[in-house]
From Swiss-Prot:
HAMAP family noted in UniProt: MntP_pump (MF_01521)
Subcellular compartments: Cell inner membrane
Membrane topology designation: Multi-pass membrane protein
GO cellular component: plasma membrane
InterPro entries found in the cross-reference section: Mntp/YtaF, Put_MntP
Protein species of origin: Pseudomonas fluorescens (strain ATCC BAA-477 / NRRL B-23932 / Pf-5)
Gene symbol of the encoding locus: mntP
Chain ranges passing through the membrane: 3-23, 39-59, 65-85, 106-128, 133-155, 157-177
Annotated protein name in UniProt: Putative manganese efflux pump MntP
Pfam families xrefs: Mntp (PF02659)
Gene Ontology terms, MF aspect: manganese ion transmembrane transporter activity
Family: Belongs to the MntP (TC 9.B.29) family.
Keyword terms: Cell inner membrane, Cell membrane, Ion transport, Manganese, Membrane, Transmembrane, Transmembrane helix, Transport
Function summary: Probably functions as a manganese efflux pump.
Presence of keyword Ribosomal protein: no
Length: 190
């Protein structure tokens, strides 16, 4: 696999995480660049690990991964999205002080994992291609970290303009991303 293909793959793998990061950034109280970098690092590390895990699983698990990855990603993103919509529509004051300054590690890790399930399947496929998995995983992780950091900062701008409705929008985005993953896999099977 040539370097251009690896870079293209890396950024393609980061698009779901970018969309989720916009939602996360909009749901926070004016996240600073350092917080955006922390979120980017968490997502980037998870996104770098999953193709390596997939690569080690190899062809033996290809059928299982192909049959279930989309359902797992859809379910996690649906639940996270519904939770964000619920939080965004609760009957409470829309004061910015109620927004968190940062999201907890486990919430970010679950979101990062949900957006990287497809990278697990890509890792399985990479096991059968002439590619250095460590270079590919590093590129995927760095691209994801960059895109998520930018996504959080974009979400900050959107959140400032939209207020609490931004959290609803973020939840809708997560549900759309999960639905798109499910649709792509189901339409490929049909």
């Amino acid at each position: 696999m040539n370097p251009a293909s690896i870079i293209f793959l890396a950024f393609a793998m980061s698009t779901d995480a970018f969309a989720a990061a916009v939602g996360k950034g909009s749901a926070m109280l004016k996240p600073r660049l350092l917080e955006a970098l922390r979120i980017g690092l968490i997502f980037g590390v998870i996104e770098a690990i999953t193709p390596v895990v997939g690569w080690f699983i190899g062809q033996a698990a290809t059928q299982w991964v192909a049959n279930w990855d989309h359902w797992i990603a859809f379910s996690l993103l649906l639940l996270l999205g519904l939770h964000m919509i619920y939080n965004g529509t609760r009957q409470q004051a829309e004061a910015e002080e109620e927004k968190p300054r940062q999201h907890g590690f486990w919430l970010l890790a679950v979101t990062g994992l949900a957006t990287s399930i497809d990278a697990l399947a890509v890792g399985v496929g990479l096991a059968f291609v002439n590619v250095n998995i460590w270079v590919a995983a590093s590129a995927i992780g760095l691209a994801t970290m960059t895109m998520v950091t930018l996504g959080v900062m974009l979400g900050r701008a959107i959140g400032t303009v939209m207020g609490q409705r931004a959290e609803v929008l973020g939840g809708v985005v997560l549900i759309i991303v999960g639905s798109r993953i499910l649709y792509e896999h189901l339409s490929a099977v049909a």
